[in-house]
Amino acid sequence: LITSAEVVADYLRETRGLKVGVVDLVMFRPFPGDQLSRILKGKKGVVILERLDQPLATDLPIAREVRAVLSKCQENGITPLNMPYPELEMYRQGDTPSLYSGSYGMGSRDLQPEGIIGAVENMLPDGKHKKMFYLSIDFIRDMPYTPKQKIHQEAIQDAYPGIKELGIRGSENPNLMPKEAITVRFHSIGGWGAITTGKNLAMTLYDLLG
């Protein structure tokens, strides 16, 4: 995720002039709230992408932690002379960014530049501003493949109104790979020698391509 997000951020800065950046969270416990409170202060919007889904939870795990940090920073701003959380920044009005939460990779989907671009576009002034969304998933297809699929989709929409709007796609999917680079995708079943096969494949490609 991070390497892809960094490349997309560079692309959006160069082609659209957007002021976007990437924060790589490498530790979950103890949660680095003090560092995040400094990094996020004054930003307009923050999107947190997580490769999981918890439909019955208030927030996804990292989004929940970040929201708690922002809330504590706001509490510091209420009583600046006696901050209840001195290890965190003090947020005044306008310091708190809008928080967005995105789920990606569901159904073993690869995260393409299109998905990350969609997450950024969602936050822009003319974006959809969906607070919680799923990247690159068409819950309801605009053009069903078959009449049966159309009937099935209608049943889904009747049971879950608004489900179509949960999916977000970007307006483009640029090829941001380095020149002459190739990608290899390896599928396997657990317990069938996937690790050894993957290592052998990597060594073979290295010997062939250098």
What are these regions (language model features)?
Residues 1-26, 182-210:
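Anionic-ligand anchoring segments at beta-strand to alpha-helix junctions in alpha/beta enzyme folds, i.e.
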Residues 3-6, 34, 64, 68:
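Feature representing long, continuous alpha-helical segments
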Residues 21-23, 47, 100:
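Hydrophobic/aromatic beta-strand patches that form the interior of the parallel beta-sheet core
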Residues 25-33:
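Short acidic loop-to-helix transition motifs that present clustered carboxylates
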Residues 33-56:
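A structural-propensity feature for long, helix-poor, extended segments
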Residues 50-166, 170-171, 190:
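Peripheral docking tails and interdomain loops at the edges
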Residues 176-180:
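Phosphate-binding P-loop
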